[in-house]
Amino acid sequence: MSHKRLVIDLDGCLASFNEAYAQVLMNESGLDPLPPGWEIDPHWPPVWDWDRAFPPTVRMNVWEKRIRRRNTNFWLRLDPLPQAKEAVQLLHMLAIKGHEVYFLTAREGQDVKLQTEDWLLMKLGMPCPTVIISTEKHHIVNGLQPDLFVDDRLSTVEALAVENWKWPNMEICLVDRPYNRDRKPHLLKDYTVVGSVLEALQQAGLDSSVNRVVES
């Protein structure tokens, strides 16, 4: 197999961001506007901007004091999502074989890149990860032109799907989440919906290439 270039999102794909963010919002504000049992509800959150249930001042204070500020370690403390460790173990093996692996995220914070690199190593076992921090994912993907792109944000995936003619060899995958199911029917043919990053890698046949090397 020729070497591939893989670009993987973090929050909602490998890291459990929403649950941690919700807990910080409630702890800092003393408010509890979320539906009962949200922590174990597989259909939560139903929308991308669920945090609007909290007042704007609360959200602003949390981002400034508990997330963006140096040494708060918000990103470092996030829990991995199910199958995240298996996915990153596979990505590590692919990187050893010479494939290019990039983690692309729109996270914010004074030391967010360092926290993210440490998280990938400490929580998922990925040494020396290549982490790109950018809110302009579309432009980063346009520049990298990867063979596989995986994200959970519908607007990002659909924006790339509209211009899929630019990247005829790129596989675009949307990780299925409750908040990204309002999909434009005419674009569904231009990307693949998967249950996890691991599933995206498996569907691309990348797990079989690693298994062949291990068995030989």
Functional labels for PLM-detected ranges:
Residues M93-I96, D182, V193-S216:
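Charged phosphate-binding loop/patch that engages nucleotide di/tri-phosphates or the phosphate backbone
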Residues I140-N142, R181-L188, Q203-G205:
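Short, charged, surface-exposed secondary-structure boundary motifs
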Residues A106-V162:
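Substrate-recognition "cap/lid" segment bordering the active-site pocket of phosphatases
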Residues P129-T135, L188-A200:
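Short acidic-hydrophobic, aromatic-tinged amphipathic segments that line or gate anion-handling sites
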Residues R69-F103, Q110-L114:
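Short, acidic loop-to-helix structural element flanking the phosphoryl-transfer center
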Residues M1-V62:
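Active-site neighborhood of HAD-like aspartate-dependent phosphohydrolases
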Residues F149-G195:
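Acidic, Mg2+-coordinating phosphoryl-transfer loop and its flanking beta/alpha structural elements
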Residues A53-T72, H99:
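Short, basic/glycine-rich phosphate-binding loops at helix/coil junctions
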